[in-house]
């Protein structure tokens, strides 16, 4: 075979290794413990905008370690992180791959504003310090009331591409886009943020919802949307809900696309420039 060589240059792969070490050192210095969550589990998420990869007879490759990390927190684990693979069906392109590296961490006692500062601190360590701007979702796409969700998603994606150069935190998402974030006191927006750097979406964080009944209701809404879109039905993760009923402590969490950050550090144009091999 002639295509045995890695996709990325050896220099990019060495740089990637250095960035992985720096990220781990940053979190260790703040007493955030590294955990390892299985990549394959019986259940996955119900979120209609994210599709899981099924492994027949075994379950699903995990789109994120979120549910199992929150189970650890409910069991008494202190602030923790995972830096490892995540998987999503149907994602392929310059900025997407079915398998990618995700850095996800949870901070006990934090809200989303405190976590935004920590995300900025980490990015400054890896990418060099620069100023950040804060915009609301409405600043980015305009009024959302009465607009179809698919139209809003397209408008948001296009608007993010235009946020360049620079670093932008986007906050105050509409309540119906809360995912698993809590709702702000205004009742109209969610305690959720996204980080966009030079037009690329990098991280997505929440002040975490704690109420098990509200989670179940949101999962029910997800299932209804899945049915309307003709998507596969996804069973609710009852072990996750049981952990919430036991009690998830006050916390905020964020998921960061590590490959994209490596891309930005190395001046690369595509994920294939900073990953050794592509599995599919």
How should each PLM-predicted stretch be described?
Residues 20, 24, 116-123, 216:
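Hydrophobic face of alpha-helices
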Residues 32-35, 78-83, 129-130:
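Short secondary-structure capping/junction motifs at helix and strand boundaries
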Residues 38-72, 81-108, 143-280:
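A translation/RNA-centric and nucleic-acid-associated enzymatic feature enriched
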